[in-house]
């Protein structure tokens, strides 16, 4: 009798589990989107808005930096002009000393000319660095603008995704809605390509700047520690 009751209890448990499994099979939660097919993932609007603010801030900083580098570039150009005039004056003085057979003075002027020419190389290297800094800040500003445009497109795409028409599948309204989503997705991706291109240009400008700074260091060392 005990064995029969135990078998009956097991049978009841199996029946209940089978019923629950059947119900779960019929009442399923919506499947999550296939991540392999999601080209542009849905993101919180707050995240996109925050990134737009960051991009604008980046652009403002780049524009402000460019103004400073422009001032330094113009100052470097002025210094080069003054140094070139100084060299011309020294060369004239050397020439006059040679004509007057003042060998010691001519030799002294020759040394001054070499020193001034070495300093001129430093100033020209500084100018190249300033010009490269301007180019980097311009590239940063262009990148920030492209990022803001791409995020704006993504923002419009997400807003469109969240406002589908209350129309059956295959209806004209639904077809127009899907076409609009596709267009926004395409324009968003195109703008993201532009962002990637701007990043590449910025990287090139930064590499050029680093190279010019190295040349400036070499020129400064040659001036301060002549062989």
Which residues does each PLM region occupy?
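Intrinsically disordered, low-complexity peptide-like regions
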Residues: 4, 19-22
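Bacterial N-terminal signal peptides
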Residues: 10-20
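Boundary at the C-terminal end of the N-terminal hydrophobic targeting segment
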Residues: 23-27
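Extended amphipathic alpha-helical heptad-repeat regions
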Residues: 31-227
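Bacterial N-terminal signal peptides that target proteins for export
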Residues: 1-10
């Amino acid at each position: 009798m005990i064995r029969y009751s135990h078998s009956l209890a097991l049978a009841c448990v199996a029946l209940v589990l089978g019923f629950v499994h059947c119900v779960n099979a019929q009442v399923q939660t919506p499947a999550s989107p296939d991540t392999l097919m999601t080209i542009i993932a849905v993101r919180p609007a707050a995240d996109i808005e925050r990134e737009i603010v960051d991009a604008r801030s980046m652009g403002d900083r780049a524009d402000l930096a460019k103004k400073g580098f422009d001032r330094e570039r113009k100052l470097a150009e002025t210094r080069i002009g003054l140094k070139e005039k100084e060299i011309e004056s020294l060369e004239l003085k050397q020439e006059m000393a040679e004509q007057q057979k003042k060998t010691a003075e001519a030799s002294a002027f020759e040394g001054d000319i070499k020193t001034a020419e070495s300093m001129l190389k430093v100033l020209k290297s500084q100018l190249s660095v300033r010009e490269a800094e301007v180019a980097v800040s311009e590239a940063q500003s262009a990148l920030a603008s492209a990022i803001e445009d791409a995020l704006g497109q993504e923002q419009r795409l997400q807003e469109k995704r969240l406002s589908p028409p209350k129309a059956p599948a295959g209806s004209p309204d639904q077809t127009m809605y899907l076409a609009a989503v596709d267009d926004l997705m395409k324009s968003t991706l195109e703008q993201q390509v532009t962002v990637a291109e701007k990043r590449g240009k910025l990287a090139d400008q930064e590499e050029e700047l680093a190279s010019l700074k190295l040349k400036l260091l070499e020129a400064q060392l040659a001036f301060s520690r002549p062989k």
